[in-house]
Swiss-Prot record:
The gene is CSF7. This is Chalcone synthase 7. It is an enzyme of class 2 (transferase). Belongs to the thiolase-like superfamily. Chalcone/stilbene synthases family. GO terms for biological process: flavonoid biosynthetic process; polyketide biosynthetic process. Pathway: Secondary metabolite biosynthesis; flavonoid biosynthesis. InterPro entries: Chalcone/stilbene_synt_C, Chalcone/stilbene_synt_N, Chalcone/stilbene_synthase_AS, Polyketide_synthase_type-III, Thiolase-like. Keywords: Acyltransferase, Flavonoid biosynthesis, Transferase. GO terms for molecular function: naringenin-chalcone synthase activity. It comes from Picea mariana. It catalyses: (E)-4-coumaroyl-CoA + 3 malonyl-CoA + 3 H(+) = 2',4,4',6'-tetrahydroxychalcone + 3 CO2 + 4 CoA. It comes from the Eukaryota. The primary product of this enzyme is 4,2',4',6'-tetrahydroxychalcone (also termed naringenin-chalcone or chalcone) which can under specific conditions spontaneously isomerize into naringenin.
Length: 395
């Protein structure tokens, strides 16, 4: 009797799991309508924050923006909103209530916009979505943005939700790692993944004693990305664009306090050590070896690349340290240029850009003609997320 029960349980457990690896079945992106030109942003920023008298600081900020490799960004915050909320424009004025009122509405709304596009591309009824993963570093609320998104989209009340708050810039990799586990361990699961980021929590006026805060003001932009992740795609119905082969997360040695953020009465404060690019470039090869040794790959130029674009210095130092062909980070640099640093959403914008440009250029795969690639998320900790991707042939 016991033996029969154990055999039944074993069969039951096996039946619960998918046969194949998790795949990305669709990608959707969204931004607020308000686009900001990076070249003129210092003039706007110092004017709207009543800081035009700080001329030397403005010149420093202009240099930061000029060196950022960003052409434009999108922002929910407009002149009207900032004029109605003067405390948001000061360097350290109590303003959390005003910021929260904005993001608890706008984060799920922008997430819905991206999710609607992903669901449309996927082409299946939204009732087939079994799980939701929602990620944001913009505000906190109960019930969370995952709940709000479920309501906004009209998903089934029984959908299984995971909410990730305050993870930061590495979390575009985190959500893929968790989605992979959900898809592969629940046969038939279809996971809606949404990362939605709004800089209304971090925007503040300049300070000549906290230049690291100004780095964030020069880099961060708003955006949301959504993916549908599932294993065993239905032939001729679902069209995967990437497979999720392997994932890892690690905390870099000697990196305590390199990047951190604190939610305070003044909003989300952002702190950064100068040597973040050095810490990442010094340790990145170890992550690559750990990921690709098992696949017999040791030439990093054989891979297609998606790296979180924390800023141009990180990309430049990674490129130099690994002797990467400059073309490897093309998609990454393009997204940085067109959108800025959108925290967790960035790597999904880059995936979208890569598969679209691969198709337009007539490449043989979604990974710029290559079979295997790497996705890196970098953020507070310093935490690094590594995702090994397999591309899909393009007909």
């Amino acid at each position: 009797m016991a033996g029969g029960l154990m055999a039944d349980l074993e069969a039951f457990r096996k039946a619960q799991r998918a046969d194949g690896p998790a795949t990305i079945l669709a990608i959707g992106t969204a931004t607020p309508p308000n686009a900001v030109d990076q070249s003129t942003y210092p003039d706007y920023y110092f004017k709207i924050t009543n800081s035009e008298h700080m001329t030397e600081l403005k010149e420093k900020f202009q240099r930061m923006c000029d060196k950022s490799a960003i052409k434009k960004r999108y922002m929910y915050l407009t002149d009207e909103i900032l004029k109605e909320n003067p405390n948001v424009c000061e360097y350290m004025a109590p303003s959390l209530d005003a910021r929260q009122d904005m993001v608890v509405v706008e984060v799920p709304r922008l997430g819905k916009e991206a999710a609607t596009k992903a669901i449309k591309e996927w082409g299946q009824p939204k009732s087939k979505i079994t799980h939701v993963i929602f990620c944001t570093t913009s505000g906190v609320d109960m019930p969370g943005a995952d709940y709000q998104l479920t309501k906004l989209l009209g998903l089934r009340p029984s959908v299984k939700r995971v909410m990730m708050y305050q993870q930061g810039c590495f979390a575009g990799g985190t959500v893929l790692r968790v989605a992979k586990d959900l898809a592969e361990n629940n046969r038939g699961a279809r996971v809606l993944v949404v990362c939605s980021e709004i800089t209304a929590v971090t925007f503040r006026g300049p300070s000549d004693t906290h230049l690291d805060s100004m780095v964030g003001q020069a880099l961060f932009g708003d955006g949301a990305a959504a993916l549908i992740v599932g294993a065993d795609p239905i032939p001729q119905v679902e069209k995967p664009c990437f497979e999720l082969m392997w994932t890892a997360q690690t905390i870099l040695p000697d990196s305590d306090g390199a990047i951190d953020g604190h939610l305070r009465e003044v909003g989300l404060t952002f702190h950064l050590l100068k040597d973040v690019p050095g810490l990442i470039s010094k340790n990145i090869e170890k992550s690559l070896v750990e990921a690709f040794q098992q696949f017999g790959i040791s030439d990093w130029n054989q891979l297609f690349w998606i790296a979180h674009p924390g800023g141009p210095a990180i990309l430049d130092q990674v490129e130099a340290k690994l002797n990467l062909d400059p073309k490897k980070l093309r998609a990454t640099r393009q997204v940085l240029s067109e959108y800025g640093n959108m925290s967790s959403a960035c790597v999904h914008f880059i995936l979208d850009e890569m598969r679209k440009s691969s198709n337009e250029k007539g490449c043989s795969t979604t990974g710029e003609g290559l079979d295997v690639g790497v996705l890196f998320g970098f953020g507070p900790g310093l935490t690094v997320e590594t995702v090994v991707l397999k591309s899909v042939p393009l007909q």
